[in-house]
Amino acid sequence: MCKLRVLFIVCLAAWAFVDSFATKKGRVGIEIGYLDSLPAEIDGGLCTFYKSLDDVEKDRYVLTNDSAENAYVMVNGKLEKLSLVANNDENYLYVNKDYKLTVKISGTRFSAKRDYNYIVAFLIIENRNHDKRKIKCYGFCGC
């Protein structure tokens, strides 16, 4: 009886280990990709955010929004639309059923010559599994 109990405990521990490994390996995480065009819903004022200043020249942006009401970001190869739920001068919080996106503004300059704002920000996106990705971005907002 004792041997059977030990065998059962060993099998249970082995199953838990294998299940835990498979769950961790199965997690996708968060990869932020580039948008290849503006979503059709955007009409009027917008902001676009880039991973690097080189991406600005190539017009390769990772986030765009329509006057801060909705944000669009490519996550794991899928275009996600998130809605604004809270904001102040430096933070914007967007959510949808799968993700929470925080845009933290760390610096802003206005260019009267070109009629837009230049922004330095951090994008923090989190999924329901609490996986997070944080990237520094450079943005331009205007009409």
Predicted regions and their residues:
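A mature extracytoplasmic/lumenal domain signature
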Residues: 77, 86, 105-109, 139-141
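Short, low-complexity, Pro/Ser/Thr/Gly-rich segments in the mature regions of secreted, periplasmic
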Residues: 133-143
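Acidic, glycine-rich flexible loop segments
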Residues: 88-128
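Short capping micro-motif at the N-terminus of alpha-helices
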Residues: 82-83, 103, 135
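Exposed beta-strand and adjacent loop surfaces of beta-rich binding modules
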Residues: 68-70, 100, 120, 132-134
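Bacterial Sec-dependent N-terminal signal peptides
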Residues: 1-24
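An ectodomain-focused feature that recognizes extracytoplasmic/extracellular
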Residues: 23-85
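Short, solvent-exposed loop/turn motifs
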Residues: 46, 79, 100, 131-132
